[in-house]
Curated annotation (Swiss-Prot):
Catalytic activity: 5-oxo-L-proline + ATP + 2 H2O = L-glutamate + ADP + phosphate + H(+)
Family, as annotated: Belongs to the LamB/PxpA family.
The protein's Enzyme Commission number: 3.5.2.9
Entry's Gene Ontology BP terms: carbohydrate metabolic process
Protein name per Swiss-Prot or TrEMBL: 5-oxoprolinase subunit A
UniProt superkingdom: Archaea
GO MF, any single term: 5-oxoprolinase (ATP-hydrolyzing) activity
Amino acid sequence: MRVDLNSDLGESFGRYKLGLDEEVMKYITSANVACGWHAGDPLVMRKTVRLAKENDVQVGAHPGYPDLMGFGRRYMKLTPEEARNYILYQVGALYAFAKAEGLELQHVKPHGALYNAMVKEEDLARAVIEGILDFDKDLILVTLSNSRVADIAEEMGLKVAHEVFADRAYNPDGTLVPRGRPGAVIEDKEEIAERVISMVKDGGIRAINGEWVDLKVDTICVHGDNPKAVEITSYIRKVLEEEGVKIVPMKEFIR
């Protein structure tokens, strides 16, 4: 059994410092690097790509809405043309830094409100996927496990990594409980580890109301901006490996 560990990194910009990138990078296999619109800047992007290279971590683009003030967590209504070109612009920007460091991009994982909106809006999902295909048909789309987005991407010829979240509660329909609601974010590492093992070994998790939710797991997201990120990430990796799960980059098993 193989699984990828990913984290959203490179989300500092200017004098604003966010996340524990250097420490978290030691335990993950894939880094989702902010592309300057919801977070990140050219200096941070280059630094994060270089850090990934030093730790033998695969690099992926983490594009979002043009929303620095809201950290990309506020919904924006986009036309398909806007969405397609916003993705192409951001992925291309990160690719420049990857190429400068002698790396290729492995994947694309949309950020925040854009990620969630794609699950609800098929036209938006198609436009984002078209933007990725415009750039490189061999990239992997990281999206919500068992979502319609995954089906659409595969229908359009794009490889997919089904993603689950280690520290987030789920609704019965397989979507994430919004961050502002009680119980949405889980902070206890023991509980997080138990949930991750359930996802990987049992193929699902109990939703916030107790119902069972089936989940396919290719990659597990651990958030790098959590104050306990290093403790949680290292513990998740340790527990998974003790259960006989191999932690490897998604490109090694998603073809």
